[in-house]
Design a protein with these regions (language model features):
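N-terminal flexible segment immediately upstream of the FAD-binding catalytic core
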Residues: 1-55, 71-103, 269, 301, ...
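C-terminal substrate-recognition/cap domain of FAD-linked oxidoreductases
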Residues: 21, 239-395
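Flexible loop/turn segments at secondary-structure boundaries
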Residues: 25-26, 72-75, 113-115, 218-220, ...
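Short cationic amphipathic helices and targeting signals
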Residues: 39-44, 105-106, 226-231, 310-320, ...
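FAD-binding subdomain of flavoenzyme oxidoreductases
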Residues: 94-98, 108-109, 113-256
Length: 395
């Protein structure tokens, strides 16, 4: 038996440690990369077990990597050397505290974005940034380690922009608190208590410490939502419209499909999936008349309206009132019209908003191809040029 495995087996309960060959193979890779084989997977249930594990690995000189939901493709939890120990945070998924008065929530790092959102929604709040499309599996800790982006990003930015404090187990096994939580008897209500140590542990893929808890700010759920879809003949006008919409903070989510992606997605989607998603839309609407109206609109529009669309843009807006949402929608229409956009049925953003954490099926194409997302963050002024350079690679 590997020396470090022997040590941790004596320190920790056997049921949280596995050296099963199939599990070792699975956990030695992410969605994209197969790394060197690890020697063990450990699923700690509390902070004490994380600390004991780290100290044992430090004593043996064994590297550690930390895994959240396993949805990434950046080699963030791939070992750099064989016989490393992988910490799977899946068992540490508790929602520790919801403080509605001071507007924060503290969760364990293995909590999924979906679990957190569904726990908070009945209370009338959500986190400012509230996860990725893969959020039924992707975790809060993983999102902070990768600095993920999507739900809420149109107004609130990335995951790392929306953290008040983190609890981190250091490479020596000590527990470090950041933000105001670092002060004894103080609540974790603000990030800035002395130097911004919180930021050190965000976007690090777990390399600088093991995040075991995080405290995130809460915002009210929207009183009203608006949805829009537009078709563009070229990418340039669409990107200019998206940039202006973002500069004016008109949406919480604004995203687009290139011609290849949207044709593939329309080909793969099934009528059964459409029916399930329509059910989600109806549950998301208020009032029986509005449920019937929106259900009929989506059913009648189907997917045919996308047949001749080259570049498509979709927005989801949030307002405190219907009047505010309507005002945002009008401004979005004006911006898109000025760039030559043609308005489409709003069924795609409406369905997505009603089913924010759908099946994670974008790793395989409609005909069995292997798909891998490629991401980047650029300023608005560089958007058109960067897309042109990317497209040139494939021409």
């Amino acid at each position: 038996m590997n020396a470090v495995v022997s040590t941790i087996t004596q320190l920790l309960p056997a049921e949280i440690i596995t050296t099963d060959p199939e599990q070792i193979t699975l956990y030695s890779q992410d969605v994209f990369t197969v790394g060197p084989p690890i020697c063990a997977v450990v699923r700690p249930r509390n902070i004490d077990e994380v600390q004991a594990l780290v100290r044992a690995c430090l004593e043996r000189g064994t590297p550690i990597v930390t895994r959240g939901g396993g949805m990434s493709y950046t080699s963030g939890y791939i070992a750099s050397a064989p016989d490393s120990v992988l910490i799977d945070m899946a068992s540490m998924d508790a929602i520790v505290e919801v403080n509605l008065e001071d507007r924060y929530v503290t969760v364990e790092a293995g909590c999924s974005w979906q679990k957190l959102y569904e726990h908070l929604a009945p209370l009338g709040v959500r986190t400012a940034y509230w996860g990725t499309l893969s959020g039924r599996y992707a975790t809060v800790g993983g999102g902070l380690s990768q600095n993920s982006i999507f739900w809420g990003s149109g107004q609130s930015g990335t995951a790392a922009d929306n953290v008040l404090s983190v609890s981190v187990v250091t490479g020596k096994g000590d527990l470090l608190e950041t933000g105001s939580a670092a002060q004894q008897r103080a609540a974790p209500f603000t990030r800035h208590f002395g130097p911004d140590l919180t930021g050190v542990f965000l976007g690090d893929c777990g390399a600088l410490g093991i995040k075991v808890r995080a405290t995130l700010p809460l915002v009210p759920l929207a009183g009203a939502k608006g949805y829009s879809s537009f078709a563009f003949g070229e990418s340039g006008p669409m990107l200019r419209a998206m940039a202006q919409i973002s500069r004016e903070s008109l949406t919480t989510e604004c995203f687009g499909f290139d011609p290849y992606l949207q044709h593939q997605r329309m080909k793969r989607a099934s009528l059964a999936a459409d029916a399930q998603q329509l059910t989600g839309v109806l549950q998301n609407e208020s009032g029986i008349v509005n449920k019937i109206k929106q259900g009929a609109k989506i059913a009648l529009s189907g997917r045919r309206f996308m047949d001749d669309v080259e570049w498509a843009m979709f927005t989801i807006s949030e307002g405190r009132t219907e009047a505010e949402a309507d005002h945002q929608a009008k401004r979005i229409r004006d911006i898109c019209s000025s760039e030559g956009g043609k308005e489409l049925p709003d069924s795609i953003p409406r369905i997505l908003a009603a089913n924010p954490f759908g099946p994670v099926n974008n790793m395989v194409g409609a005909e069995g191809e292997r798909w891998l997302p490629v991401h980047g963050l650029v300023p608005h002024s560089r958007g058109e040029a960067v897309l042109a350079e990317v497209e040139a690679v494939y021409e």
